[in-house]
Structures are given as structure tokens and as C-alpha cells.
């Protein structure tokens, strides 16, 4: 059953805390993308549910920084002024902070693209339908949840979670997009690469 847009939940990665971090003072917490860039001087590390989660989150942040500062360079070029990208990075390094008004301007421009459940959900394809299969449980989405028949060395219990928070879903989505292994994938309606139902 599809929900209307007004019924759909909202979870925007720019504003909602979802990135687990360890702080310089030894505390832990979750921050939004906007907070992450605001508090860079007080954040020691990104700390995912598993260590491998940090890399895709960091990669997303790096893409945001690259795009934001590329817009600065494009603006200079539009006015026939040359700007050295190394000088831009040197400014950031010396200030020990990012240009928050610049980042906030970028976040405002792309805000709708970072909603986990919006009409164009973050890093997802709208309208995919499984060809002949029920949905997999959420545990299939989580890398360190073992299948019951293969449970041996795991830090988790045999009981697979039935639900996860929106923050966890965002982290595991990035993880899956970065590290999902090859193999048999559930066929979706319209996929022309399906052979023998796989």
C-alpha cells in the first residue's frame, strides 16, 4: 500500500542526527550533516555501527565539500577571475573550519534530495517492484546480522531485528551502496538483465 506524500515519514539527512561521532572530549553522539560541518573542530571521528560504515559516510561528506567549493570556483570563473583551488583548501585548513554560510547555501539548494522518504528519496530508486518475491526482512540490509542457518561467529544475537531507526537505515543504505557484494539480486519489474528469474 502506497502512502500519500503527506502521510510519508520525513527524515532529512541535512537536519536530522544520524551520523555517529566520537567527540574530542570523549563523548559520543549523533549529528546531522549540517552539525557535522559546524562542529568539525570538536569531532574526533565518525564512528559507524561497524567500522566499515565510517568510510561511506566520510565519502558522502567529501563529495559535499567538493561540490560546495566547486561552486565557489565556478562563481569566480563566471566573473572572469581565476582562483586557485589549493588556496581555497589552504584557507579551510588555516581557519580549521569550513565556510558555513557557503555550505548552508548549498544545503538549502539541495535540501529535498537528502530526504530519506521524499518523492525522490536519498540515493534510492522510486517505483521498483519485485518481480515475484516478497520483501526481504530488514536484517538483509544489515551487514553484521547473520542468517540463522549460518550463525557462528557474530557480535549479534540470533534474533534478527525487525525494525531499525531512520538514522540506522540511512547509515546502512550508504554502507550497502558502497560495499554491497555481487551475486544474485532479486529481479525487479522492467529489469532486462534477468536470466532464469535471477
What is each stretch, according to the model?
Residues 1-156, 160-198:
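Conserved small-residue
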Amino acid at each position: 500500500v502506497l502512502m500519500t506524500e503527506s502521510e510519508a515519514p520525513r527524515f532529512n539527512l541535512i537536519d536530522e542526527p544520524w551520523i555517529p561521532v566520537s567527540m574530542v572530549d570523549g563523548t559520543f553522539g549523533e549529528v546531522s550533516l549540517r552539525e557535522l560541518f559546524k562542529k568539525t573542530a570538536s569531532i574526533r571521528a565518525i564512528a559507524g555501527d561497524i567500522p566499515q560504515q565510517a568510510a561511506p559516510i566520510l565519502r558522502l561528506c567529501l563529495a559535499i565539500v567538493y561540490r560546495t567549493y566547486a561552486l565557489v570556483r565556478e562563481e569566480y570563473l563566471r566573473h572572469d577571475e581565476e582562483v586557485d583551488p589549493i588556496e581555497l583548501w589552504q584557507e579551510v585548513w588555516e581557519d580549521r573550519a569550513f565556510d558555513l554560510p557557503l555550505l548552508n547555501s548549498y544545503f538549502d539548494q539541495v535540501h529535498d534530495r537528502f530526504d530519506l522518504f521524499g518523492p525522490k528519496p536519498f540515493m534510492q530508486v522510486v517505483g521498483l517492484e519485485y518481480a515475484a518475491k516478497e520483501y526481504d526482512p530488514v536484517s538483509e540490509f544489515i551487514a553484521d546480522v547473520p542468517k540463522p542457518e549460518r550463525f557462528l561467529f557474530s557480535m549479534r544475537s540470533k534474533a534478527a531485528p525487525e525494525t531499525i531507526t531512520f538514522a540506522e537505515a540511512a547509515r546502512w543504505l550508504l554502507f550497502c551502496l558502497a560495499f554491497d557484494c555481487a551475486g544474485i539480486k532479486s529481479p525487479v519489474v522492467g529489469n532486462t538483465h534477468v536470466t532464469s528469474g535471477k
